[in-house]
């Protein structure tokens, strides 16, 4: 993937506009989970060290266009970054028309870009105003790279130079390594509640991977396609034929979708529900499947341990409830121990990684949700595509 890289540029005294992903949860004016800020600091620090005049913006929440509210303000983010840098960081509220100065070696935070008129629609006029504020535009928000907006795509068209930040470069390198030059066997684990939301991902991966592990509600649709009774479990009946054809397609090229042989069931979705282990072909009509059993988990552990590359997106059970979390825990442990290149992404997956404390044992953790999935689908991400065009 040929894009201009931030680290190859001379930034001294240059006006640098960074689009980061600082969309973090905020409660009572304080950031409650700062992983995305931490991930963005490499690019910010690099620009400051080089003596650039640094501006950074991001979206936060879902503000109404043209309406500023305290709950969608980046002020808590600016405070968090100021604490990290050990110096004050100004928040510039109305910045689209310019009219503010930034000193060399200074960082300012530009208020939530989604408040700006024309941001979401990627209006040319808005994008040109953004571009006029900088000498160098840095795209560092992989999490929004699948959206063509004025701050992710439009500005990159018109800025004198448009490049990829350190985080974006790392994300693209890791994803490319996992999907375009993978060490085999290539294993993908796709969990989640619905086949429909991940159907295009499953179809795309079914052509590439050696083993496609399905988990969560998605797996129930495949269990049913394999002829099992799944009781009252979450399932999309209309997609059973699709699941069947994916299984056939993979079998034809000697690849597999492993189907659970044992499952953990309950009668209702509740934190105090008793977990009962059953063979996959012995599920009662009033059972709900909430996890895979130990035999199935062991099969997946063996697959992961023998893999060359593992891509993980989504848990395999209701891991929020400990009694239905053993399958996901076993997978997490195997991912931590395997010699394979491991890549994980998506909110629930990161929550599982944190719960089972394997954060530093995964080769690469993607901060993105939707963009991560679209890359897995083999889709072109508009914000990356424009950087490639600008590098020509």
Swiss-Prot record:
Compartmental location: Cytoplasm
Major localization class: cytoplasm
Binding residues annotated for substrate, in chain numbering: 21-23, 36, 59-62, 114, 147
Catalytic activity, as annotated: (2R)-3-phosphoglycerate + ATP = (2R)-3-phospho-glyceroyl phosphate + ADP
Keywords linked to the UniProt accession: ATP-binding, Cytoplasm, Glycolysis, Kinase, Nucleotide-binding, Transferase
Record-listed E.C. numbers: 2.7.2.3
GO process annotations (BP): gluconeogenesis; glycolytic process
Superkingdom as given in the UniProt entry: Bacteria
Gene Ontology MF terms in the entry: ADP binding; ATP binding; phosphoglycerate kinase activity
Annotated ATP binding sites: 198, 320, 346-349
One GO cellular component term noted in the UniProt record for this chain: cytosol
Gene3D superfamilies per UniProt: Phosphoglycerate kinase, N-terminal domain
Pathway(s) this gene product operates in, as recorded in its UniProt entry: Carbohydrate degradation; glycolysis; pyruvate from D-glyceraldehyde 3-phosphate: step 2/5
InterPro entries in UniProt: Phosphoglycerate_kinase, Phosphoglycerate_kinase_CS, Phosphoglycerate_kinase_N, Phosphoglycerate_kinase_sf
Assembly and binders: Monomer.
Family per record: Belongs to the phosphoglycerate kinase family.
Protein name: Phosphoglycerate kinase
Gene that this polypeptide is encoded by: pgk
């Amino acid at each position: 993937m040929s894009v201009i890289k931030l680290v190859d540029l001379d930034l001294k005294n240059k006006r640098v506009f960074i689009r980061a992903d600082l969309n973090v949860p905020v409660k009572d004016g304080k950031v409650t989970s700062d992983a995305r800020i931490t991930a963005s600091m490499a690019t910010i620090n690099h620009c400051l060290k080089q003596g650039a005049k640094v501006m950074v913006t991001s979206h936060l929440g879902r503000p109404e266009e043209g309406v500023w509210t305290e709950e969608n303000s980046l002020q808590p983010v600016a405070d968090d970054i100021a604490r990290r840098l050990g110096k004050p960081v100004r928040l510039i509220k109305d910045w689209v028309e310019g009219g503010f100065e930034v000193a060399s070696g200074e960082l300012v935070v530009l208020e939530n870009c989604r408040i700006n008129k024309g941001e979401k629609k990627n209006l040319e006029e808005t994008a040109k105003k953004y571009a006029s504020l900088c000498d160098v535009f840095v795209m560092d928000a992989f999490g929004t790279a699948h959206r063509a907006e004025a701050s992710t795509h439009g500005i990159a068209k018109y800025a004198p130079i448009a490049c990829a930040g350190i985080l974006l470069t790392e994300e693209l390198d890791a994803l490319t390594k996992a999907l375009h030059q993978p060490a085999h066997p290539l294993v993908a684990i796709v969990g989640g509640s619905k086949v429909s939301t991940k159907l295009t991902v499953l179809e795309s991966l079914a052509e590439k991977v050696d083993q496609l592990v399905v988990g969560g509600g998605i797996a129930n649709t495949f269990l049913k396609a394999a002829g099992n009774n799944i009781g009252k479990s979450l399932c999309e009946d209309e997609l059973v034929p699709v699941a069947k054809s994916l299984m056939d397609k993979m079998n034809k090229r000697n690849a597999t979708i492993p189907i659970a042989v044992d499952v953990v069931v309950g009668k209702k979705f509740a934190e105090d529900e008793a977990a009962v282990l059953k063979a996959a072909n012995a599920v009662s009509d009033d059972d709900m499947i909430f996890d895979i059993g130990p035999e199935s988990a062991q099969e997946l552990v063996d697959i992961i341990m023998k893999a060359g590359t593992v891509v993980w997106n989504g848990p395999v059970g209701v891991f929020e409830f400990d009694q239905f979390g053993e399958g996901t825990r076993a997978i997490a442990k195997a991912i931590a121990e395997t010699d394979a290149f491991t890549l994980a992404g998506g909110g629930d997956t990161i929550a599982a990684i944190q719960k089972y404390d394997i954060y530093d044992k995964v080769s690469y953790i993607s901060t993105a949700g939707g963009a991560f999935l679209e890359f897995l689908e083999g889709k072109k991400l508009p914000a990356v595509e424009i950087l490639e065009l600008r590098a020509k």
